[in-house]
């Protein structure tokens, strides 16, 4: 018992009571069942079938408790009941064919069909452990219907989205047997438990009645109470629930069997073909939802009798035809129901639930009595039904069949049979109170009428029935379903089958009408017999009440006088044991009777085995009292024959043997008198325990079968401490084998707990052999004890041997029947066709998938979208490569910018150096080296730019190749697609041709096979005719031969007579001989005819059995057809549902397709944006190229400005040289003047001796300038530089320039020519000087330089400077060797550094790209420029 919802609501402090709660779960499993459900529900009608409102689910809800139903959000909900009772939150709902309870807060009502004020019915909700409310129910009219059972939901979420609606089948026709071993109890159908739902082909159907083939299937029913549907299954009581009732309450429930059948009219039996259809179709579809149902059904099917299956194969048509007959029996139901109380109704319903699903018949009636019933049809329909139920129910006694039947004893047997039949016939008479439920039993009895009486009576074991039962599946006279024409067009086949069955049904109806007319004549006699039986029942009830009162008084006396009665009971048991031994010896003498008893015991043993497999703990609590009561009754039956003739044992309400019903006959005789003529031995058979049991349960090897029961019985007999087990165990075999041994009453059993060991229940049964009670077993007496035990239990061993032999025989017969069955070929063919169908479905799916793929490609081709994904992928790859190239170019541009910055810094340094050189006039060589370094860097940058251009050209070429390759691949794929389409079309054509050819071959094969079968049938018919003719001829000749032989014997006799007495007339002798011969021939022929008559009778019986089997097969086929029609309707319903589902799926796919198209368009837009991005990248690359060109042009402009500065500096140097030459001439003139003055001075000095101080001379000298010469000498500049000289104030040279002349070394005088000039003359004004003399060869001659004075400082860079100088002199500054530059640098008109159009300061801070260069003139190449631009 699961407590999911109760545990969720449990308070934290209850965790300390876990042990107590576990005990409550074990002892009171039904108290917690309906914890989450309300005790009432508010409905619009008493059945809770009318839909109150329609709505949808607000949320998705999984099952949270027993009885609740799971659903998903927005699931359609039909409300069947609303809030009432203890729990106002739950509504009864129907979701997708599943019924259960749901929280009203989770339901959104959309449409209200019945207003709340119109909800007038409060229907109780009853759990499986609640007490049964018995209501005195009046007889209903024929129009009354049975209370339906709500569909129950399953506890899993798998069926929440089931879209298949349930089949519209009458709810009373659905019957499922469930194994009690699964859940220890049967839950309430309204609680949505699995036990009440039958899943047929994925559809859940409500169950009207569950007739369990168990001992515990108690089904109390009240037709007027709305709880009937819920109580029907829930009353299979879990006897773990203790009920505190006293002995008086127990006695109130002890009622005879004669009063039970009348209440059976309140609840219909299940429709048999529903079980058959379920059993046959349960495995056709493998749904995960009905795995639990299949398991439970399998457990019940294993225990189900084959006769039940055969009886279930009755048609609905016959039951409908016989329905008006049962309506006439309502009067007797009134009479019988007036004499019952509530407890009798309960037990009558318990009895019916057993009789509906009981195993094989265990009684055989008197031969002449049943022949009178069947041949003359004196008993009406209901009496025969009662006989069928008596044969198929365990609680009925076993009757012995005697072949020698006398007329007076036959009346006694009929009397006894009527005692057993009429109570059940009353049940059948009461069943017309409900319309549909009467059909199955009537149909079942109809089949019993058709059965020959010999097959019913002569068999004492059910073996023949078991052998013939499986033949119901053989098809009779129907066209083969698996022919090609029928398989391809099953509708025509079913139509043909329906027409044939309609014809057969019409013939059967005609026969049925005749038979009904004959049976209508017997109604009056039935009423008379029913009145007589009613009187008998009333007398039996009175005697039972008297006996119950006597028992109650006896129990009270036994409680007062316990010790005294124990001693009396011991003596009584000894006497009983002796009498049982005498009876056993007498039974051994009557071997036919013993064989019948053994067979009946074996059948009862089988039934006990089947019942013990299904019962878990339903009937084991009352075992001590039941055991004692049963033994007490049987003791009184054996010890007091006169009393037993009038008062038979009274059934206990709590006893599993309460089904033993005992009648009182007015023409009562002793038991010994009745044994000879159909003596009915009251054999106790198990029934279920009532809900008021109070004794604990002992599970007696339930679920382990007959072997475990036998082992348990043997252990009880030979155990050392038997008092704790045998008296309390549910040992059915012991009760069957020892019916005459009395039981100890409850008061005695309570006292036995304190009694000594030698008077306990075990030893009390064997006081005759008191020495074996507590005898210790040793090696010495082991053999003796075992021998005694074997003798004591000889009947048990005999039963075990008979059961084993019967089981082996049944298994062998079933195995032979299965091997000889004709279904193997059909099944193999069916499997082959299913495999081929599955393969065809798989091939069709594959072909359909290929076709859809091809169509998708074609549609994409038509929409010009084919290969767009590939294009996008290629474009993405191309975009990544372009982004990579862009990154490389950006890195190159960054390196170029860094180089430009370096060049700008170098220019700044050059400007500084130039300024310093110009100031000092000594940095020409360092300046030239710096200029050469910058030129070298410029050349490197040109190389890098050339490599970048080459890589760009390579990438462009690769892009063009990729585009060409893509176009070529697209064309090739289009051509391949066209080829594949053509091949596909050819394959389709070939497939259609092959299919047509295959159909033709199949048609030809079928026609040939039909012709061959027709020829074979014709030959067989011809041979049969010949055989018949030859047989007739042989019989005629054989008769003549026999006549001749008789005549010959007669003539021989006559001749012997003539030889003895010759007086007789010869003619008379001849005549007498002829007559005697004819007489002998006729006598022999009479013997042969008698043998033939016997053979024909046996053949007739066989043909009748075959006819019955054929009729059963016809009915089975009708049921199959009806089931197939239902399956067809179900399939159509499912087809509609699936069509709707696939339409919704198609709409969803269309929506998804539109989304995908939107995404595709988005991807197309992304592709377009990618192309645009690529175009932008290309434009950006072009922009970067233009920027690169602009930077290059700027560098060239800076070079040009540097050249202009160099030209300016050269001009200044030339002017300085001219000034130096002028100073040199002035110096030469001054030297010449000084020489002349020196000469004058010398002359004066040489002539100064004579003049020596002559003032005149001095004046003359002074007059000639002597004093001026002295002044000039004093004021003349010193050849050494003075501190104030500008040469000393010149700034320090740059570190990488050649050091100037040191001051201490002195500089060449400005009036001296440059060193190394070689006496060359200075150049003319405004011109460069001439090249120096070729003192160094041709190399020095070629490298004419304006600054050749410093050439010796840098000899390592002479070649580069020579190239630069050649460019300078040739006017090729900035000219590229490889045509790197496409534009000429910027030119200026003025090369003067003071020109305002060029700002030298811009090179220090301004790095913006210069304006784009002008286009290249058409007349000139891009790499040349005129000399005037320099």
Curated annotation (Swiss-Prot):
Question: Compositionally biased, Basic residues: which spans?
Answer: 1364-1380
- Topological domains (Cytoplasmic): residue ranges? 818-1430
Compositionally biased spans, kind Polar residues: 594-621, 1387-1402, 1420-1430
Question: What is reported when this gene is inactivated?
Answer: RNAi-mediated knockdown results in basal membrane proteins such as vkg, LanB1 and Trol accumulating in the basal ER.
Q: Name one GO biological process term.
A: positive regulation of secretion
Q: Where is the composition biased (Pro residues)?
A: 1321-1334, 1408-1417
Q: Where is this region: Disordered?
A: 253-272, 284-303, 318-362, 445-524, 568-673, 1105-1126, 1312-1430
Q: Where is the composition biased (Acidic residues)?
A: 284-296, 1348-1361
Q: What is its main location?
A: Golgi
Query: Would I find tRNA processing among this entry's keywords?
Result: no
* Locations listed in the record: Golgi apparatus membrane; Golgi apparatus, trans-Golgi network
Signal peptide bounds: 1-34
Q: Which UniProt keywords apply?
A: Coiled coil, ER-Golgi transport, Exocytosis, Golgi apparatus, Membrane, Phosphoprotein, Protein transport, SH3 domain, Signal, Transmembrane, Transmembrane helix, Transport
Q: Which InterPro entries match?
A: cTAGE_MIA/OTOR, SH3_domain
The Phosphoserine modification is found at 865, 868, 1345, 1348, 1390, 1392
Q: How does it sit in the membrane?
A: Single-pass type I membrane protein
Summary of the function given for this chain in its UniProt record: Required for protein secretion. May participate in cargo loading by binding to COPII coat subunits and guiding SH3-bound proteins into a growing carrier. At basal transitional ER sites in follicle epithelial cells, mediates the exit of basal membrane protein such as vkg, LanB1 and Trol, from the endoplasmic reticulum (ER) to basal Golgi clusters.
Family indicated by similarity: Belongs to the MIA/OTOR family. Tango1 subfamily.
Provide the protein name.
Transport and Golgi organization protein 1
Q: Which gene encodes it?
A: Tango1
